[in-house]
From Swiss-Prot:
GO cellular component: catalytic step 2 spliceosome; post-mRNA release spliceosomal complex; Prp19 complex
Protein name: Pre-mRNA-splicing factor SYF2
Biased composition (Basic and acidic residues): 66-80, 94-117, 153-164
Region (Disordered): 66-164
Protein encoded by which gene: SYF2
Length: 195
């Protein structure tokens, strides 16, 4: 029994030491170190009179280089299409996408224009069955897309700690705020060393 308590205590101290280490700061430090090494190699190659980019390209095959260029091009296209991510630009893109898929019935419009029904205010307009079908199909398509996204977003949950979507959002917000404080308690509870 004494061995188990000492091993638990050692594990507790190791975990506490790991918690004190800031993983984000370590990653930042490592990235800066890699950038510094890269710059050092570049300067050394320039001092020797070598073409640094050409020397680096020796490590890659032609296929890898082409795939990398294609990947960069796709990323550049995505970034240029997406632009700034705010609600008004997102709504504008959705509107333009819907407008591009919208096919107006010009024949019916011309007939209404000739008869004068288009310009007189009246409440006796009845849409055609085709127009109603298009409306219903558009609405069901949007609903299916929203449900698909909702299912994909919830697929990664191991166990449900919520009763509705709003409650799930609230719980996620709490987790972001308090996980750093409650992680140790949860780990102790799972390990069986809770006080």
């Amino acid at each position: 029994m004494n061995d188990s308590s000492t091993s638990n205590r050692k594990a507790l101290f190791e975990e506490d030491k790991d918690l004190k280490v800031n993983k984000r700061a370590d990653a930042l430090l490592e990235r800066k170190q890699q950038e510094a090494e890269f710059e050092l190699e570049k300067l050394q190659a320039e001092e020797r009179g070598e073409d640094f980019d050409r020397k680096r390209a020796w490590d890659w095959t032609v296929k890898e280089t082409e795939e990398w260029k294609e990947k960069k091009e796709r990323k550049r296209e995505r970034e240029s299409q997406s632009g700034v991510h705010d609600m008004s630009s997102t709504a504008q893109r959705a509107y333009e996408k819907d407008l591009a898929s919208f096919k107006p019935d010009l024949e019916t419009y011309e007939k209404e224009k000739e008869t004068g029904l288009h310009h007189t205010p009246s409440f006796n307009h009845k849409p055609t069955p085709e127009a109603l079908d298009r409306l219903v199909n558009g609405l069901t398509k949007g609903d299916k897309q929203r449900m698909k996204r909702r299912k994909q977003a919830g697929a990664d949950d191991q166990h449900a700690t919520y009763i509705s979507d709003k409650n799930k959002q609230f719980n996620e917000k709490l987790n972001r705020q308090y996980d750093k404080y409650t992680k140790e308690i949860r780990d102790n509870f799972e390990r069986g060393t809770a006080l």
